């Protein structure tokens, strides 16, 4: 019961919500809270969000966040609870989402245990039947990891918004990395179910890529020029993105520009394969 009391104090959840979540008697939780020296208040109507924000997908921001939720959002199976937790390094991105839905509460710090180590993360959570039902209708369902399907393209008021959905999903379940020791060749990976990824790549400028299975996880991989093409497609002229991945994209843009300028300067000069001039795009380890 001590953990439930702590969650009541830390998250501002209602007693009714905690009773459903932990299958405990609401009165017993109330008594435990009072015994711990805290006041019991009616929180049922204190937490507010714009629960109709996804009723129509008609802006870049809505399409992007829907894609991100398909990757990292969590809709509960029974109690109409939504939760999204991100690593501490992405705290600002979660705050953007919190502002996007006009959440009346701030995001909360939580401790996550992984491989016997404890890490800081931040969580946005609330109860809203309409919000959760809308996500489920689009395909963002509970326990979606192994059953996720791509949404019907007709939910987007403009087909151009599908690209923003793709970017949102990539920011959540994709990565930008390298595939050689010198960190000079870009590689991007996108994880998901086979069914979802097959539909996802249909909207990319390069498709028909083979989906590989790595540690039981299906993924699409694009290397070198194809990886750069996909990044360009996803991020160019966009206004909302995960900042750290966008910075990696810009870093590769600068490096590829230098490479192209070098190659152009060598045209007609009898390019020396052993030239001492190199292009360094590592600037440390590139991974996201």
Question: Language model features by range: what are they?
Answer:
Residues 1-288:
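Internal intein/HINT superfamily modules and their associated LAGLIDADG
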